[in-house]
Amino acid sequence: RNLAQSVIMYLIEPFFKLTALENDIGQQSRLLNAIIDQWRYNGQIIGREIPLYLTEEDGEQGFAMRVICPEQDSLLPENNNQTVNLAMEHAEKYGLNFQGFQIIADDLNADSTAECSHPAWQMLYTTHLQSCSPLHSGDDFSPIPLYKQLKNQPHLSQDLIKWQENWQACDQLQMNGSALEKEALSEISEINSTLSKHGLYLAAEIEKESGIPTYYYLYRVGGHSLESEQQRCCPQCGGDWTLDAPLFDVIYFKCDQCRLVSNVSWNFL
């Protein structure tokens, strides 16, 4: 995959100064976890397992956490959406003031972030192994931070993260090959499944908001032969959607009318 135009993700430590006299750690943790949730739904941080701990910085007591961010400046206030700011204001009422953050290190295990946040086209794509935005550039396949396009649509951004969680859960089940394998596979590979319908709706809403053609990735596995796979038509309109050459070793099919992309069955790749 060509990731020449991308930048690494970062391990970052935000710090909240504690100015309250009484120390209700349970309540303070809940308020900070609410900020973590909203940062995540806005795409400012990646992943769900966030350590939160008491610490001291420059002689001041407070809380810190370790988060993965797609960019060095992801946590700057200008990237906040309305719901992040509300969670911050709520925490401030209880004496928790966001003081800033320090960059600890580059995260060498993370997926890289797109440098161009407004490509010629983009797609909704994820896998059970990915820890990044589900919005991928059609220019170089790298993930685009959600706040770059959806900061003014918090509900849409959150809905997209929920869709990603569901897609990854189904992918994990079908890859494990045990409980609910068949049902999970049909959710990510059938055009009329609940998950695919949700994803197509989200892609259309994102295109409306961003003005960028936004496609939905339909997973493909099985099939009879490589030859029959290559002759596959668009499952929505029945049209020819085969690309002259595959993109990023993944995308072999692209229907501009239906805003769909797909792979040749993984059985033959």
PLM features: residue spans?
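Domain-scale terminal segments
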Residues: 4-185, 212
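A composition-driven signal for long, intrinsically disordered, charge-rich low-complexity tracts
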Residues: 51, 144-147, 188-190, 217-230
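A short, highly charged nucleic-acid-interacting micro-segment common to nuclease
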Residues: 184-197
